[in-house]
Structure formats: structure tokens, C-alpha cells
């Protein structure tokens, strides 16, 4: 397993007093990939995409928003798995964590809020 899904840029430099960071979420595979985006700190961070399908070699814009708050070591986790049908509802797939499969896993993005 390599890097099936990545973010560009791979880091999120948002100030502790709040802000927005835009990233490209990229599917590097020749398969449709379902994803779920999780945050270690839902009080301070939100994203525009939580569940979805990245089609073959697709790119979507992920917008990360931070509310003002104390800086700490937070992270975003993009869980993913391969799906055959691009019209699959991704939400039930992640009800028990990352589904097992040939192409499944997680991509971790460090969120570094600077003061």
C-alpha cells in the first residue's frame, strides 16, 4: 500500500486566532475511493467535505477552517477504501472505522496552529 489519497499542500498552517486553509485532496489510484475526513479537535476545526467518493485520479478541494483557540497538536485523518461503484453511499462504509480491503487505509495531516 502506498499513498492512495494525499493532500496538497500536505501541511495546514492556520493561525491560532482562526482562519481557512485550502487543499487539493488527490486520488492517486486507478480505482474509485470512498473517504471520510475526521479531526482530532472538532471544537476548533471543521472541513467542507466529511464523506465522499474520489473518482479515478480525481481531485477535490478540501477547505479546513479553524476557530480561534489555544494551539495544540491536532490532526486530520482521511480514512479511505476502494469502491466499485462511484454512486456508493460512503457513510455506512465507515460506521466501524476503516473498512478492510485491498486498497484501504488512512492519511494523517498534522494541523499546526501558530500563535
Curated annotation (Swiss-Prot):
PROSITE patterns: MSP. Signal peptide: none annotated. It holds the Pfam family Motile_Sperm. InterPro entries: Ig-like_fold (IPR013783), MSP_dom (IPR000535), PapD-like_sf (IPR008962), Sperm-specific_class_P (IPR051774). Residues 1-115 form the MSP domain. SUPFAM superfamilies: PapD-like. PANTHER family: MAJOR SPERM PROTEIN, MSP DOMAIN-CONTAINING PROTEIN. This is Uncharacterized protein ZK1307.4.
Amino acid at each position: 500500500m502506498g499513498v492512495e489519497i494525499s493532500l496538497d499542500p500536505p501541511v495546514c498552517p492556520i493561525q491560532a486566532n482562526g482562519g481557512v486553509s485550502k487543499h487539493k485532496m488527490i486520488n492517486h489510484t486507478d480505482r474509485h475511493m470512498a473517504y471520510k475526513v475526521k479531526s482530532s479537535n472538532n471544537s476548533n476545526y471543521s472541513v467542507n467535505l466529511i464523506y465522499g467518493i474520489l473518482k479515478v485520479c480525481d481531485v477535490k478541494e478540501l477547505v479546513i477552517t479553524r476557530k480561534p483557540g489555544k494551539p495544540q497538536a491536532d490532526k486530520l485523518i482521511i480514512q479511505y477504501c476502494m469502491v466499485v461503484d462511484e454512486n456508493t453511499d460512503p457513510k455506512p462504509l465507515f460506521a466501524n472505522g476503516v473498512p478492510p480491503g485491498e486498497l484501504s487505509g488512512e492519511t494523517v495531516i498534522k494541523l499546526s496552529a501558530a500563535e
